Swiss-Prot record:
<keyword id="KW-0227">DNA damage</keyword>
<dbReference type="InterPro" id="IPR003717">
    <property type="entry name" value="RecO"/>
</dbReference>
<dbReference type="InterPro" id="IPR042242">
    <property type="entry name" value="RecO_C"/>
</dbReference>
<dbReference type="InterPro" id="IPR012340">
    <property type="entry name" value="NA-bd_OB-fold"/>
</dbReference>
<dbReference type="Pfam" id="PF11967">
    <property type="entry name" value="RecO_N"/>
</dbReference>
<comment type="similarity">
    <text>Belongs to the RecO family.</text>
</comment>
<dbReference type="GO" id="GO:0006310">
    <property type="term" value="P:DNA recombination"/>
</dbReference>
<dbReference type="Pfam" id="PF02565">
    <property type="entry name" value="RecO_C"/>
</dbReference>
<dbReference type="GO" id="GO:0006302">
    <property type="term" value="P:double-strand break repair"/>
</dbReference>
<keyword id="KW-0234">DNA repair</keyword>
<dbReference type="InterPro" id="IPR022572">
    <property type="entry name" value="DNA_rep/recomb_RecO_N"/>
</dbReference>
<keyword id="KW-0233">DNA recombination</keyword>
<comment type="function">
    <text>Involved in DNA repair and RecF pathway recombination.</text>
</comment>
<protein>
    <recommendedName>
        <fullName>DNA repair protein RecO</fullName>
    </recommendedName>
</protein>
<dbReference type="InterPro" id="IPR037278">
    <property type="entry name" value="ARFGAP/RecO"/>
</dbReference>
<dbReference type="GO" id="GO:0043590">
    <property type="term" value="C:bacterial nucleoid"/>
</dbReference>
Length: 244
């Protein structure tokens, strides 16, 4: 079994003295893991977020297999000096590595990850919007999508103020106010991003949106064993608070 593709490196683990296990999210073959040779003398050490051309080979598709790769571009320089960007890259790549099924193409998630990473590379002032869209898309593609288009009870699309923590659906102010203590707030920014509206936002809007999305990630994916993901999520919120 042998194929070639292009992808984004989302995890690297050392394996022995001269090998690494790489997780690459590819365009046509989805998430794939494989062994690759590691050399301290290499001109470029593979990093999270690198774009690579890869050749994967194995006797069976279910086997770990081996990678040969060629660097297309490195994005490390564009995020490593910004702790918030680094943590967002870290959280998104780790959770993709943990929850995506192998050998299943998902161009929708791949495209969102690609747009997010490129927004950082090209210093897009709206990179945070691209990140929220990535998280919304990941939840949706894995079967836990939010529905922020209209109220789940009366079907109105006006005054959507809350989100049901059970269903992930929006609830209008009129319907939800008596039950506000048991509902999640619906941040205006998250509503705008979901519905592809124009947006203006502050760090508070970004933080509130991440808190809501974080609730659903914890509900569906993050257990007590996912200490690294929980740590990354907490660090993202702390870093937002430190911003001017």
């Amino acid at each position: 079994m042998r194929w070639q593709d292009q992808g984004i490196v989302i995890a690297i683990r050392k394996y022995g003295d001269d090998q690494i296990i790489i997780s690459i999210f590819t365009q046509k073959h989805g998430l794939k893991k494989g062994l690759a040779k590691y050399s301290k003398k290499a001109t470029h050490r593979l990093q999270i977020g690198d774009y690579v051309n890869v050749t994967w080979s194995s006797r069976l598709i279910s086997n770990l297999g081996c990678f040969k790769y060629e660097l297309i571009k490195s994005t490390l320089y564009h995020y490593i000096q910004d702790n918030l960007k680094t943590m967002c890259i870290a959280f998104s790549t780790v959770i993709l590595d943990q929850v995506l099924p192998e050998n299943e193409e998902n161009y929708i998630i791949y495209n969102c990850l690609d747009i997010f990473i490129n927004s950082i590379q090209f210093q897009d002032i709206n990179w945070k919007i691209k990140y929220l869209r990535l998280e919304l898309t990941l939840l949706s593609e894995l079967g836990f999508g939010l529905d922020l288009s209209r109220c789940a009870v009366n079907n109105t699309n006006e005054n959507l103020t809350f989100i049901s923590p059970k269903t992930g659906k929006a609830v209008s102010k009129t319907v939800g106010l008596p039950y506000s203590k048991s509902l999640l707030p619906l941040p205006q920014l998250l509503y705008d991003v979901y519905n592809n509206y124009e947006y203006k936002y502050s760090k508070t809007d970004f933080k509130l949106s991440l808190n809501v999305l974080g609730y659903f990630f914890k509900k569906h994916f993050l257990t007590e064993k996912n200490t690294i993901l929980i740590k990354y999520r907490e660090e993202i919120i702390k870093l937002i608070d430190l911003r001017d």
